[in-house]
C-alpha cells in the first residue's frame, strides 16, 4: 500500500518510469527542483511511521516541523526512505525507497523512476548545464540570471562555493565558502561559484562541478547565478 501510494506521487509529479524491473528498494533519481522534497513530505504526512533519513538532513516541512533523520551508523531501519542515498554507499536493501540526485553524487544505482525536469533552474543555467554535461534538463522556471565576472574586480553575491583548486584562496577572502560536495541537499537562491577552469574542473570532478570558460590556470574565475527555490 505504501509503495503504491509512493508510485502515484511520482507519476503525479511527472517522474518517468525506466525499463528497470521493479525491485526493492525503489530507486528514484531527480535533479534539483524536480519535486523530490515535495514527494517525501506528502508521503510522510500519509505514512509517518516510515522515517525519512538523509546523510545531510534538512527541514522538509517548516509549518509542521518535519525533519529528516540523520544516518549515524551503517545500519538503516527496515522500511526507511533515504534521501541523498548516493552520498555514501551503504546496505540499503531493507529500505522502502531511495531518493538521489545523480548529477551531484557518486554511488548511484540504476533508477526505477527519474525526472530531468526542474522548477529551480531557469533557462540560462539549464542551457549551461546541458552543454557542459551533455544532459537533457527541461527548465520549468520562468527566469534566472547568469553572470560571468572578474573575480578580482567584482564581489561575490549570495552564497559562495569554490572548487578545490581555488578553495584555499577564495575561503581566505570570503569566510563561509564551501566546497561543492559540502552543499549537497542545501538550497540557495543566489550563488557565486569560483574555479580556475570550469571545463577542466568538470572533467576532473564531473559530479560536483558546474561550468565556466577558460581563464589562466590557477587564477579563480567567478560566475554568479540566481534561480528559483
Report each predicted region and the residues it spans.
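The feature marks helicase ATPase cores and/or their adjacent C-terminal helical subdomains
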Residues: 1-229
Amino acid at each position: 500500500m505504501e509503495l503504491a501510494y509512493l508510485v502515484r506521487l511520482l507519476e503525479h509529479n511527472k517522474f518517468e518510469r525506466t525499463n528497470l524491473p521493479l525491485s526493492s528498494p525503489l530507486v528514484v533519481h531527480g535533479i534539483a527542483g524536480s519535486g523530490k522534497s515535495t514527494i517525501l513530505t506528502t508521503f510522510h504526512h500519509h505514512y509517518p511511521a516510515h522515517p525519512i533519513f538523509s546523510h545531510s538532513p534538512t527541514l522538509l516541512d517548516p509549518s509542521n516541523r518535519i525533519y529528516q533523520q540523520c544516518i549515524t551508523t551503517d545500519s538503516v531501519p527496515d522500511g526507511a526512505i533515504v534521501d541523498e542515498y548516493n552520498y555514501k554507499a551503504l546496505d540499503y536493501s531493507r529500505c522502502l525507497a531511495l531518493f538521489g540526485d545523480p548529477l551531484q553524487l557518486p554511488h548511484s544505482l540504476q533508477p526505477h523512476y527519474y525526472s530531468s525536469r526542474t522548477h529551480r533552474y531557469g533557462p540560462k543555467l539549464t542551457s549551461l548545464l546541458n552543454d557542459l554535461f551533455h544532459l537533457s534538463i527541461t527548465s520549468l522556471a520562468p527566469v534566472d540570471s547568469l553572470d560571468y565576472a572578474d573575480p578580482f574586480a567584482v564581489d561575490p553575491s549570495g552564497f559562495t562555493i569554490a572548487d578545490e583548486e581555488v578553495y584555499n584562496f577564495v575561503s581566505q577572502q570570503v569566510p563561509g565558502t564551501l566546497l561543492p560536495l559540502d552543499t549537497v541537499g542545501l538550497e540557495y537562491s543566489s550563488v557565486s561559484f569560483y574555479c580556475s577552469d570550469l571545463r577542466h574542473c568538470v572533467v576532473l570532478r564531473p559530479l560536483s562541478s558546474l561550468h565556466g570558460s577558460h581563464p589562466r590556470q590557477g587564477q579563480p574565475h567567478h560566475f554568479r547565478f540566481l534561480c528559483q527555490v
